[in-house]
Swiss-Prot record:
It comes from the Bacteria. It comes from Mycoplasma genitalium (strain ATCC 33530 / DSM 19775 / NCTC 10195 / G37) (Mycoplasmoides genitalium). This is Uncharacterized protein MG343.
Amino acid sequence: MSHKINDQTLVNEQRLLAYDFFQNSNKVGLLSTLQYLDFVNFLVRSKKVNYLLVNKVSLPIYQKIYFDNFPFLGFDNNLWSAFGLALRNKSQNDTVFAFVEKTKNTDTEINKFLKILKTFKGLKIVFLLINSPEEKTTIKLSDSLIKEIKKQKIKHEVYSLRSFQNKFFKLVRKLEKKHKSKNNVMFVELNGVFGYETNFEKSNIDFSFTSFQDRFTIEKKLKITSHFILPHKYLLKNLENIKHPNFEQKNLIWQQTVKDFNQQFLLHYSKLQVFSNSPTKLKVDALIFDLEFHLIVEIMKGFNFDENCICLLEGNKEQNPNLPTVSLDTKVADIKTYQGCYFLNN
């Protein structure tokens, strides 16, 4: 007997995969994943998203339930790292989509971002603002910040799942028609899909389950209208068919070999190997930011998302003594430990 696989069944199966991967170790990451999985599915299956930043603690869970078939990225501060990624890929005319968890500091950081943004042109970023499981209350952008966002002619929207699915890409297409000399930036606050609190402390999910039956019981508590009716393994095959178009091509930055070594994933980027063996000296392109040092580091992380360039920082080395120091005379091939961020010693 055959059954049609509907979207809800697929999402249920992904949740079970998240439970499997969870193993009582990453409760905050799991909560965030469950809360916004439907939004992520919509973006992935649209095949219109080349770069999707998710919160760092959820990154390994997303990679697990999508079988590494989609290029998820995750940083310590997605607001600034998405900015760095957009700077790096400005010439490619790609829009960066980034999930940013709202905290008590989000208003302050977005205000800083808006001031810096004025000095750049042609950037395309969509910030998807979500609730943080680590916050005790639901946080919304302040009225004064929303007023400032609109003053700079930047779009601000609040979407539930249904309105997100119906309206989001229509708005994105409209903004992408802007002239290349203008910034295409948008802030979208998303409302989660479940009836339980997103806050970890208030969540009514029982994390003590150990068996498949326990997970199935928990799944029923989430007030989901349709439950899986097909064998577990059969659904996994269908999940494997969700592939991002970048993976269907060769010689892209996402091309990598993954080896399981001592329970750690080792990533090898083909372009990096060619670049690091080059005898040439370091090439420096300067970007100047009037920001605190730690925020510049977050921008650098996004700028060097594929670990295929070297980001140089001028600043007080005492602020981060773990970063190695290089000079303009340093040969790329002489750098033994490749980290992506270095202090520039003139």
